[in-house]
Amino acid sequence: MQDSRRPCIVAGLRTPFARSGTVFKDVTAVQLARRVTQELLERTALDGREVSEVAFGQVIQSVLTPNVAREVSLLPQLPPTVPAFSVNRACASAGRAISYAADQIARGHADVVLAGGV
């Protein structure tokens, strides 16, 4: 790849581990993704206007909110026009979203991509 930029992960955050059916049993995947993303934006002091795109993986998509990335992109810290899409590749969903983000940066299509998964 000529003139490739070298992407880097600037910050990462995740929810604590918990047994299934316990502390997170009443929290939706979208709520988890939004909480973690909000906290990440606050900790890094990243200006949401710098985000070029949002990519999220979701192992089991909800019928009510099939595009978790779009739900995350509606956070008040991000511009409402930021493109967002979700990936579904079973357990590799988040990894694929992060890989896509790195590719977009390496190819010069984006400067900052918010990527993750639930």
Ranges and model annotations:
Residues 88-118:
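Active-site-proximal alpha-helical scaffold in enzymes
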Residues 53-55, 86, 113:
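Short, conserved beta-strand segments within well-ordered enzyme catalytic domains
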Residues 1-82, 118:
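Conserved "HGTGT" condensation-loop signature of ketosynthase/thiolase-family condensing enzymes
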Residues 81-89:
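Short pre-catalytic strand/loop immediately N-terminal to key active-site residues, enriched for Gly-Thr
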